[in-house]
């Protein structure tokens, strides 16, 4: 009986972890699971105002490209938009927006997107938040040669290899940046945030194109922290622009916020339910600093 209970617990934790790190794995949710996550999102009161685009038009692409190019090198921005356009040209018929429009929450038809993507790309699942963020930042941040823990990056690395997204050197740097970080068995976010600050302090970040990370706590195989979602925040004419790829299947989003704090609130409310019993709630990092509310 004890053995069976242990196996059940491992199975539940595995399912929870795959849901928790939303852009870590290709998501094949049941309709019931999707409805549950949507209902959680709908129950959250929105504390921010924003407009968004999936960059599915030339004007929106050029606007976002200009904002990114002001703080990032041309090669990285070009490589990023190659990924954006490949995705949008493949699945853009699934109600992806061009012009910026009012943004509260989005709900995409993952099944339709997958049915468009897979016939063209086979077993290449596409790219996620971490891959795209690294694509933008790789030439403007300094990543030290550290021992890496890429145990939760197996799908990311498989996608990188099958899509020939990065070479060996970039893949190694990617694994270091998004390594799993050891922590303690506590629900105290302050403890985990200090661990993450210590780890990320070893990197030299871009002060203008800022890496905003949602860090999640996992206890499946020891106590650890992991960047479950990430995107890039840059200044724009009207405030700030946040660029993200939601999951392997789900689209790119460029979101305009009036303030950095509004972007922090967006990430905090979107991922606040991605936790479990005995685990700390997710928290936000701005480059190497914990964002406290």
Map each language-model feature to its residues.
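Bacterial N-terminal signal peptides that target proteins for export
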Residues: 2-11
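Acidic/His-rich structured neighborhood in mature extracellular/periplasmic domains
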Residues: 72-218, 222-227, 235, 239-250
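Low-complexity, Gly/Ser/Thr/Pro-rich intrinsically disordered linker/tail segments
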Residues: 242-245, 258-293
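A short, polar/proline- and glycine-enriched secondary-structure boundary/capping micro-motif
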Residues: 250-260
